Design a protein with these regions (language model features):
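Charged, amphipathic alpha-helical coiled-coil/dimerization segments
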Residues: 74-134
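N-terminal positioning helix adjacent to the helix-turn-helix/winged-helix DNA-binding module
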Residues: 8, 23, 38-39, 101, ...
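C-terminal regulatory/oligomerization modules of transcriptional regulators
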Residues: 1-4, 127-150
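Hydrophobic structural patches
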Residues: 16, 43-46, 136
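N-terminal helix-turn-helix DNA-binding core of bacterial DNA-binding proteins
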Residues: 25-65
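Alpha-helical linker/hinge and terminal dimerization helices associated
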Residues: 16-19, 23, 27, 62, ...
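N-terminal leader segment of winged-helix/HTH proteins
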Residues: 1-33
C-alpha cells in the first residue's frame, strides 16, 4: 500500500473508531437505567425484523460469539424483554422473539436517545447525513465480507 493510501486508511479508521467510541459513550448515558447498548441493539433488531431468530443468527448479525449473544439473551430473558423457546423442528436449536415488555423497553430507549441523535443530525444537516449513509453501509459491507481464500 502506498504511503498516501496508508495515511488515508489510518485517518479513516481513526475517525470511525473515535466516532464509535463517542456514540457508545453518549448512548450509554441516555439509555434507560440497566439497559446496555447490546440489549438495545438486539431488541431493536427483533422489533424491526418480525418473527423469530435463532441465537446463532443473532450472533452472526451482530458479529459476536455465540457465548456473548447467549449472555445478552439471558439478561434480556431475565428482564422479560424476550421469549426463548425450543425449535419444534430441531430440539437442538432455540428461537428468540421480542415480548410486549421488550417492545415497550425498546420504544422507551428510542425515546431517550432520539433527542441526542436529533441534535447530531441538526448540527450536521439532514442532507449530509443522508449522503454519508451509503458510504458507511459500503464500508460495513466491505468489512463484514469474508476474506477470499488464496
Amino acid at each position: 500500500m502506498s504511503t498516501d493510501k496508508n495515511a488515508l486508511a489510518i485517518s479513516l479508521f481513526s475517525e470511525v473508531l473515535a466516532a464509535d467510541q463517542m456514540v457508545r459513550n453518549r448512548l450509554s448515558r441516555v439509555l434507560p437505567k440497566g439497559m446496555e447498548i447490546s440489549h438495545f441493539s438486539v431488541l431493536n433488531h427483533l422489533a424491526w425484523h418480525e418473527g423469530e431468530r435463532t441465537p446463532a443468527q443473532l450472533a452472526e448479525t451482530f458479529n459476536v460469539t455465540r457465548g456473548a449473544m447467549t449472555n445478552t439473551l439471558n439478561r434480556l430473558e431475565w428482564a422479560g424483554y424476550i421469549h426463548i423457546r425450543p425449535d419444534w423442528d430441531d430440539a437442538r436449536r432455540k428461537m428468540v422473539a421480542i415480548s410486549p415488555a421488550g417492545l415497550r423497553a425498546r420504544d422507551q430507549a428510542l425515546s431517550s436517545i432520539a433527542p441526542m441523535v436529533g441534535e447530531v443530525i441538526d448540527k450536521l444537516g439532514e442532507d449530509r447525513v443522508r449522503s454519508t449513509l451509503p458510504i458507511l453501509r459500503q464500508l460495513r459491507d466491505q468489512l463484514s465480507s469474508k476474506p477470499k481464500p488464496d
